[in-house]
Regions:
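Conserved AMP-binding/adenylate-forming core of the ANL superfamily
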Residues: 35-89, 106-111, 164-169, 215-216
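Conserved AMP-binding/adenylation subdomain of ANL enzymes
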Residues: 219-244, 248-355, 366
């Protein structure tokens, strides 16, 4: 079965609009309007569309002055901040290629990524990232310059390849005066086939591979994800606010913030750090919010921790609210996310009593559209958020198809699935293996310098082989069973998807990580890591003393607590899928 929905998004080579052109157009229309904010010294600083476009041009000129030409690679190694976007779009504006690194990449991985991509310039955030680069720069023959954003600890370094960001921007200003028509000429020469970014995918069975996305890929993805088939209803506008906190070198964050910002004009707020996401959420109160399951699970666990520590009266009110939320969630799930008279009545009771304060406390009071992707999420977590008025739409996509595959849409939600194919997306299941295959104009053009791996991933007919096993639900929605390589076959010949069991276990506020094992074994076992905050709080309220994480995890009471969570999960699955140890 092959499913395809009509799309108004452009074909890869037809009428595409580049990212720089979208920024330019936004700046031309509403240059004085704020497009992003970052926090400095405790105060949110505004950056307008005019500021954005001006800095993008200066970056493009600065890169050109340093010898960067179309097709060259520019690497960015920084946390989420405005300069990441300036560097990214400025690079694309001169038809060069952006390559992002995770802030947590150690020096050895930095060396590999710089070597494999052949990056000529690295834009590094601070002393930590500069030190990594200097440690390996002798092994990176293509690397010519290291531009640092934060001078603290670096300004006194004496190295010929180092350059301060402000000096870099001033260099661009000088070059702009010498060649003011550069950006316009580059824009006129841009094609749909120009590679704009290398996004390196995790190398679980080998070194990371750089997925090449083009102007045409990104244009189709922006139109499809945001205008045509996203989970937003209505589509994003200039009045919407997003929080940027997931790594910008990942396709999900590009789609959720950078592309949405350029396409729809939403305002980006950059989280101060990954550790402050919860506090920044509460402060910013975004209207659109995308998160990976781990974030949703952490918010879910945090709510339970706070309620367990509340006064008896608050616990009573909270308990009543959660009963309402459960009834609302169950009703919404049964009706594909559509409200009924019953759910509206229950929500009208629960919102002023519990839900409003609860949503405000976790930073989700204003959220009108929420998404989850990049990994499976437990249905129990989704039901909870449904019940308090935050409907989370599961999304499925990957780097190799620019995050465009399937999505649950408002009013057509099927819990446990990743939704329907996006408009303009062909999707089918391999008859022999059940592998999900997709085909559309945002499918990447291949892996950088790895034609053999590309041939293994895209077949002669243009179908992308995702590596995920799926199954149709009601002939319209796709359910992800698991990665092909992760399917467990027990000694009894039973095929089991470990991710479903693992996600159910992690729905417990007391379990942080779970790995199910059972290939060629008579029964399943699980390695479980407890959630220190919630279990520690639980132990403290029961006056159970402990000294270390290990000491806490080995307490008989905690072992019993974990076993109860395992038993609750086992009740949801067939006997062959039960965790025995």
């Amino acid at each position: 079965m092959t499913t395809v929905l009509e799309s108004t998004a452009p074909a890869a080579g037809a009428g595409f609009v580049t990212m720089p052109a979208r920024i330019r157009d936004q700046a031309t229309r509403e240059g004085a309007r704020v497009c992003m904010r970052e926090k400095r010294y405790g105060i949110w600083q505004d950056i307008t569309w005019a500021d954005y476009w001006e800095t993008v041009q200066l970056v493009g000129h600065a890169l050109t002055s340093l010898g960067i030409e179309p097709g060259d690679r520019v690497a960015v190694h920084a946390e989420n901040r405005p300069e990441w976007l300036f560097a990214d779009v400025g690079t694309v504006a001169i038809r060069a290629i952006t390559m992002g690194l995770y802030p947590t990449n150690p020096a050895a991985e930095v060396a590999y990524l710089l070597q494999d991509s052949g990056s000529k310039i690295l834009i590094a955030e601070d002393q930590e990232q500069v030190d990594k680069a200097l440690e390996v720069e002798a092994d990176c023959p293509d690397l010519q310059w290291i531009v640092y954003l934060e001078p603290r600890g670096v300004r006194d370094y004496d190295h010929p390849k180092l350059m301060d960001w402000q000096d870099f921007i001033e260099r661009g200003r000088v070059h702009q005066g010498q060649d003011p028509g550069l950006i316009d000429r580059m824009a006129a020469d841009a094609t749909a086939d120009d590679i704009v970014t290398l996004i390196y995918t995790s190398g679980t069975t080998g070194p990371p591979k750089g997925a090449m996305l083009t102007n045409g890929n990104v244009a189709f993805a922006m139109e499809t994800l945001i205008a045509d088939g996203g989970f937003y209803n209505p589509p994003p506008t200039v009045d919407d606010v997003v929080l940027s906190y997931l790594p910008l070198c990942h396709v999900a964050e590009r789609a959720a913030t950078t592309w949405t910002n350029a396409q729809a004009g939403v305002t980006i707020h950059f989280a101060e750090s990954i550790e402050t996401v919860q506090a920044n959420l509460k402060e910013v109160q975004p209207t659109l919010f995308f998160a990976v399951p781990r974030i949703w699970e952490k918010v879910y666990a945090g709510i339970h921790i706070k309620m367990n520590a509340a006064s008896p009266l608050k616990k009573l009110v909270y308990g009543f609210g959660m009963k309402l939320a459960t009834r609302i969630g169950d009703e919404l799930v049964a009706n594909e996310g559509n409200h009924t008279a019953k759910t509206r009545l229950l929500y009208a009771i629960g919102y002023p009593l519990v839900f409003r304060a609860l949503r405000d406390r976790v930073g989700l009071r204003k959220v009108r559209a929420a998404g989850s992707g990049a990994a499976p999420i437990a249905p129990e977590v989704l039901r909870f958020f449904f019940g308090i008025g935050v409907v989370i739409y599961e999304i499925y996509g990957m780097t190799e198809n620019a995050a465009v595959a399937t999505v649950n849409r408002p009013g057509r939600v099927k819990l446990g699935t990743v939704g329907e194919p996006q408009p303009g997306t062909e999707l089918k299941l391999d008859a022999a293996t059940g592998e999900i295959l997709t085909r559309h104009p945002a499918v990447f053009v291949g892996y950088w310098n790895k034609p053999d791996k590309t041939a293994e991933t895209i077949d002669d007919d243009g179908w992308l082989h995702t590596g995920d096993v799926g199954e149709w639900v009601d002939g319209t929605h796709i359910k992800i069973v698991d990665r092909i390589k992760d399917i467990i076959i027990t000694a009894g010949g039973k095929n089991i998807s470990p991710s479903e069991i693992e996600n159910s276990l992690k729905a417990s506020p007391f379990i942080k990580e779970a790995v199910v094992i059972g290939d060629k074994r008579p029964y399943l076992t699980a390695l479980i890591g407890i959630e220190l905050d919630s279990v520690g709080d639980w132990a403290q309220h029961r006056r159970i003393p402990y000294t270390t994480y290990r000491d806490l995890a080995e307490k008989p009471e905690v072992l019993k607590l974990v076993q109860e969570a395992v038993a609750a999960t086992n009740d949801r699955f067939a006997r062959a899928e039960n965790v025995r140890k």
